[in-house]
Amino acid sequence: AYDVALLEAKGLPPEVWPAPRHDDTLRRYRRLCVAERAFAQSVVSKLAARPRAAAKTRAGVQPRPSASVVFCIDVRSEILRRHLESALPAVETYGFAGFFGLPLEARDADGEATPLCPALLRPAHAVVVEPGPKSSAAVAGKLLSALRKAAAASFTYVETLGLAAVYPMLRAASGHEAHGPGCAHAHEHHDVSLEALRPEVRVSLARGIVKNLGLPRDPGRLLVLTGHDSTTTNNPQAAALACGACGGHGGGLSARVAARLLNDAEVRRALAAHGQGLADDCVAVAAVHDTATDLVRLLDRGLVPPSHQGDLHALEQAFAAAGARARAERAPHLPGLTERDRSDAAALERCLTRRSADWAELRPEWGLAGNAGFLVAPRERSRGANLEGRVFLHSYEAARDPDGAVLELILTAPVVVGSWINLQYYASTVAPDAFGSGTKTLHNIVAGVGVLLGNEGDLAQGLSLQSVHDGEKPRHEPLRLQVFVEAPRARIEGIVARHAVLQQLLDHEWITLYVLEDDGARATRYTPAA
């Protein structure tokens, strides 16, 4: 109205008035803000119902847990954690970035290095993976794979050896190809050498794990470090389903290294000398959560002493029960499942295992579709709350972090990476032509660095259509990341003031931050300074 009055006062005729700008954009922006506020309110209302559990923990009346299980902060872990705590109430769970704070790279016998840390970091240390003697078939397979991916030789490969791929394709299509755990996840069972890590480095890495996790001195008799991976076949975007904190690789190797460090006798003595000692009967165990099937594989079982085998068996049974419940929760959202597939727990497990090994399956799982929140708080704040697999969960105890160093690390690393993941799903959903990578059925891998759609065009970026859409409607609800932090407001403000990356995310509204106060009963939206 003000603009119209001004134009009339200037004597300009209506036909030269500028058209209303961005009306549709503003309407969509308002709807986005309303949807984000509704999601944030739903999370806060669920958290507000659990203040008494947190108060009990701070009062120190909670008994020692039967096991302490560390999961990755990945939203898919939320479902399994919730069901594990239901199946085994005496268990205690933590959320931590799936590389467990270890900036490592894995080197194989040929000297090839694979980074196992987030893109924000550069590997500072190396571990050597020793797969043992290679068969002639394995060597030949590696050579053929390199030939197939070479820029120029790939054409010759197709012309001369393309027909040889017919039989393996027919076997895969008929379901007779070997895709068992021993085949798809053989790296989880290779020997790992920590000889390249000097004693002081091992101690430093272990101290970081204990400090950043906020572990008490008496965690459970089993301290289970659970990485995650996804079983998928013929999928150029398999890295999007693996662990982002491990550089798009599986988290099994990082979990194994972390467990070895925490079980090392010299490291234990050094931890005790620094006031970070763990109970003498606490044994660290490595595990992997397969997010496609919700099966949990326990690694290096032979390193667990006989005195703890009973504890391990009980935990394994709880993992099995939790996995069955998690599969049942996810099943209604997976396209293509029949009533027969969902008829009972065993049938559903077989179905999801078969889907993960099916080279023609476009949606073996939904990955992080639906992600919208990031919670930085003690687990007692959210334990028992159904967050629907939409929230990253990072454990944090403000009382154990008086100088704010741990919180600063969380806000500047995992939260930033979480915003990247969230924006990747957001952009691939709202603007798939510009920021997605089209349909998987047309993907052609180019030199192992990206995909083309068919045989022309530029490298496609972002997620495939099948990663965010079920064929009828979007599976991912595009919301910007809502971050909830239970910590003193002054501490949060100080951290934001020191880091431009956080100021950019908050000032430009790529993320929204809420400060949880009064035992989670109240959430105050953080407003950047003008």
Regions found by a protein language model. Name each.
Residues A49, A53-G60, I209-G214, R221, ...:
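Generic recognition of flexible, low-complexity loop/linker segments
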Residues Y2-V4, R256, R260, V376, ...:
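Short, hydrophobic/amphipathic alpha-helical patches that form generic packing surfaces
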Residues P306-A530:
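Long, compositionally biased intrinsically disordered regions
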Residues L163, M169-V203, V288-T353, V391:
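Active-site/substrate-binding loop(s) of hydrolase catalytic cores
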Residues I73, L102, T226-G227, L375-A377:
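Generic beta-strand/beta-sheet core signal
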Residues A1-A196:
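N-terminal extension/subdomain marker
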Residues A35, F39, Q62, V75-L80, ...:
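Short, glycine/acidic-rich beta->alpha junctions
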Residues V91-P115, A119-A137, H187-L222, G227-L312, ...:
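Catalytic or ion-translocation cores adjacent to nucleophile or general acid/base/metal-coordination motifs
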